[in-house]
Amino acid sequence: MIKITLKDGKVMEFEEGIKISDIAMKISPALYKKALAAKIDGETMDLMTELHKDSSLEILTFEDEMGKWALRHTGAHILAQAVKRLYPEVKLAIGPAIDTGFYYDFEADFTFTPEILEKIEAEIKKIIKENHKLERFELPREEAINLMKENNEDYKVELIEDLPEGEVISFYKQGDFTDLCAGPHVPSTGKVKSVKLLSLAGAYWRGNENNKMLQRIYGTAFTKKSELDEYLNMLEEAKKRDHRKLGKELDLFSIHEEGPGFPFFHPKGMIVRNILESFWREEHTKAGYQEIRTPLILNEALWHQSGHWDHYKENMYFTNIDDGDYAIKPMNCPGGILVYKNSMHSYRDLPLRLSELGIVHRHELSGALHGLMRVRCFTQDDAHLYMTKEQIKEEVVGIIKLIDKFYKLFGFEYFVELSTRPEDSMGSDEDWEIATNGLKEALDSIGKEYRVNEGDGAFYGPKIDFHLKDCIGRTWQCGTIQLDFQMPERFDLSYIGADGEKHRPVMVHRTIYGSVERFIGILIEQYAGAFPTWLAPVQVKLMNITDAQYDYLKKVEETLKENNIRVEIDTRNEKIGYKIREAQLQKVPYMLILGDKEVEAGKVAVRSRKDGDLGAISLEEFIEKIKNEIKAKTN
């Protein structure tokens, strides 16, 4: 008999060799029906896996991230099977699950079209209805290569040949289709109830621009049609809110072929950016942070010392200065460490909180670039905190509260994820345990719900990630708190303790916006371009009905500017209705309309983007109203 420990701590005994699916049935027939995959001792596996030793078990459904992943991974295989049935000469490349669904890359001597996608979708429905079992099997290296050669799958042969010697080579078979795959998958194609093919794109084999361009088909999969319908509605809404489209229409930013991945901020975009950065500075000063600035370019030796060279050099840009090798910084932390190291510190100085709005450069593949969301140059709102081990909990709690304040201001809900030690990590087991427990204790002490993401921490320490949920249900990872014992060790950081001896500080890396550019992109989509008044590039649009009101309009403009209200005027010889419509398209919070009646009464006719016509009021009354709104930072 073997002992199986369930997620709730309950221990059950079963015969050795029992399948996970059978355990799910014994736990609950309802759970068995919903089950898609399982976690055994933290590793995601198929439900058909047999258990031969005592293990911890978590049954995964579509509500779980890895359950969703398994279902969508199977969706990718169903797509490939449908394509091979219809077009046997097509060659398969790769087909993973991704956050929003899945994709598969194909080599074909014809171009996939929307009409062809409809045919493929119809074939997918047949395969789902046929309800083929997914059967895993393994082969020795040579047999695996021969199987793929027989199937004329050159890309699969290349993948196998690149695997290390001794690596397990596994395949999944479903009906007449077999694919090279590590898994996991759901038990049968019938579990994938609803599939939709979404779009087409080009993709270089292995992301290398020197390789062949393949055709990528994107899709998504759900266990219920209602969930798919909801998702498709969200996609339609997202198109209307696309920050690239709105950024152009509202004249906020642009991206040019002379600098792909390097955004240009226009005057209106800079207003939004400067407000966000000013607010960030104010709140950090209140919270006891001191701002620093570090250079963009630093000697290559620094990146070897920090460990970034071993873990990150593919994403870095390099240059040569005076016959020396330098790198443009991809992260701010090593520069911040040099600031700490520049002075001797006492335990009385700790915690020391150093903040930086630092510009970083990271090489992203051209196909991954996306507006402000994925760029090659961005400003990271970093802070690095240095503390004793005893201060970890209190400091992390303080950071969580600061992050919460920021996100609530912008109307975001969010969820929290604790990511633990990855395989590719630095440091001792003891350090990782202290660091991970420190983050857990901070979260537990304030009753913050979180989920554990095993093995997804940074290479130098565990982390807490904050995922924003926007108004149409999408999630964005922005804030992070990363505990680090490794950097202080590598840079020999110290402080003088109460005992007069040198001690090693603990370091915390953290961001709130994450990337200022990306956060602006998220806000554009969150508000659909209609920024709240305090954040709007133009807060008031001032317009006259005829030239007779021009002098009064200029006086009103001057008064608004004296009160630090951002105003634009529209004195064109156009009908007032046209001017109002244009201001509405520009998402301006308030329009002040001036006709002869307003001039005579010394008033302004106010129209609100949100509430429509508010009638005529004195300019003083309007200024008081808008200043109160700006001060309150209401959404």
Curated annotation (Swiss-Prot):
Gene3D superfamilies (UniProt xref): 3.10.20.30, 3.30.54.20, Anticodon-binding domain (3.40.50.800), Bira Bifunctional Protein, Domain 2 (3.30.930.10), Threonyl-trna Synthetase, Chain A, domain 2 (3.30.980.10)
Protein's recorded name: Threonine--tRNA ligase
Transit peptide among keywords: no
Domain of life, per lineage: Bacteria
Gene Ontology MF terms: ATP binding; catalytic activity, acting on a protein; metal ion binding; threonine-tRNA ligase activity; transferase activity; tRNA binding
EC number(s) from the headed UniProt entry: 6.1.1.3
Coiled coil: none
Gene: thrS
Organism: Clostridium botulinum (strain Okra / Type B1)
Subunit-level organization: Homodimer.
SMART domains assigned: tRNA_SAD
GO cellular component: cytoplasm
Annotated region described as Catalytic, given as residue ranges: 242-532
